[in-house]
Amino acid sequence: MRTEEKLSLMQRCIKWREDNIKEKQFILILSFLVGIFTALAALILKFFIHQIQNFLTDNFNVTEANYLYLVYPVVGIFLAGWFVRNIVKDDISHGVTKILYAISRRQGRIKRHNIWSSIIASGITIGFGGSVGAEAPIVLTGSAIGSNLGSVFKMEHRTLMLLVGCGAAGAIAGIFKAPIAGLVFTLEVLMIDLTMSSLLPLLISSVTAATLSYITTGTEAMFKFHLDEAFALNRIPYVILLGIFCGLVSLYFTRAMNSVEGVFGRLDNPYKKLAFGGVMLSVLIFLFPPLYGEGYDTIELLLNGTSVVEWDTVMNNSIFYGYSNLLLLYLMLIILFKVFASSATNGGGGCGGIFAPSLYLGCIAGFVFSHFSNDFAFSAYLPEKNFALMGMAGVMSGVMHAPLTGVFLIAELTGGYDLFLPLMIVSVSSYLTIIAFEPHSIYSMRLAKKGQLLTHHKDKAVLTLMKMENVVEKDFVTVHPEMDLGELVKAIASSHRNVFPVTDKTTGELLGIVLLDDIRNIMFRQELYHRFTVSKLMTSAPAKIYTTDGMEQVMQTFDDTKAWNLPVVDEEGRYEGFVSKSKIFNSYRQVLVHFSED
């Protein structure tokens, strides 16, 4: 009875809203709420991570190697993996990829548990030293908040997709205090279309989350950065070279990440993954303690250090402590091994994103580039802290294929607006370098291979939004190879189609098709009814469409074969139905009209 009362109360609230608040106004209210809830989620996650890290590492001696680095990461990914397998019982890795999939294939619907599951799993993972970032989990959390808040009020799927974007924008703005970057990330990475009806809700969520973050944690930028030397135009060639270097580092990170995760994917037992990932991660963190956690302390150090004495503290707690002459080699090895630490964290059962690793790698890459040049006098002096800042924008732009996000995020993170021009040069150079080798970002490449990626290309976007099950027609009469012509004629009489799929009677496998035009000249000659069987009359289909094919691939198959109807089969070759051009065009028009409404 109480459930029915709650249900009717919710229905009354929805009806009151529909009668008294216009939808556009209500979307603005929802975007404001999404911004508040997402910022609170970001604050909770950051607090959770810092409490665990401080409790575990506050008593470490900086002059000695700490063997607990061999233990903490394994404990973290074990606890996170156990939580995901036994409590959540769903895959919550690759948060941004899941959001892209929800937008393109699930009409903006994200499972409710993502509101809290990513916070707990990533908090444990990173707090215990997992070498990943908290940003992708909080972006998934924010998007889940937007999606489920919209679902509660029965909003249509276009609005759900917008609220998913609002959650992502609020997450970036809240965790980084970067409202512009939050908006740009949503447009550039999540491919949310920029229209007047979408811009205002995204801005409201982003500004609301950033404001709440300012109120609770102060108005200072996330990283302190003081520009000691203004940017000189004669350094532009070196800035371009840094961008190219960052693009190559991004390519290495992307390719290596996919390769190592592929190795973990082939391990079918979660405890094998834990053992493999745990050993790899703990050994790497023991040798290179800066790989512990998000790595923001290292970024802070390189952005503010001015001498070798300060930079050397990056080797604290390691077996390399005191070897100042090995600093450059030490940092280069971190660039090399960071991707393995991040992959081992996620592959072993942990939960985290690649935002922080991208910033971390970029900062070290920029520092190494300038420090190496200064040590060997390849050029005029290149300020290490300036190039470390620019490197952050370069690697982020390359890994995410998002140059604008890289520029605005780094500027807002550090207050480094005086370096806006070189930030843009580095970001564009890095982006142009990586797209020459890798056309899709680390987030989108998995979906792009399956034809499930929504882009700003309207035609491709509409095809992506279309679903195979909505265009498959199943009112075709099937025939079997052992049937004679007389039985085939009876089947023809009961159908209004001119094509007949031939299937195996026991397995349902598609063997071929019979076209009405091919038998029209003999179908009324009764003396031939027992002479011919379907196996002699059938022909091969021009091509087969698989239920797993994307609509863009389906359209390409139609163009290649010049056919009007094509059979659809599952992965085992069993007949499912037919797809026709006319059905696709009708469905395309319906989706286009709905998709284009502003």
At which residue positions do the language-model features occur?
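The conserved cystathionine-beta-synthase
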Residues: V479-R497, V502-D504, M523-Q526, K544-W564, ...
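ATP/adenylate-binding site constellation spanning eukaryotic-like Ser/Thr protein kinases
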Residues: S205, V426, E473, L516, ...
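Conserved Rossmann-like nucleotide-cofactor binding loop
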Residues: R574
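Short hydrophobic beta-strand motif reused across regulatory alpha/beta modules
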Residues: G512-I519, G577-I584
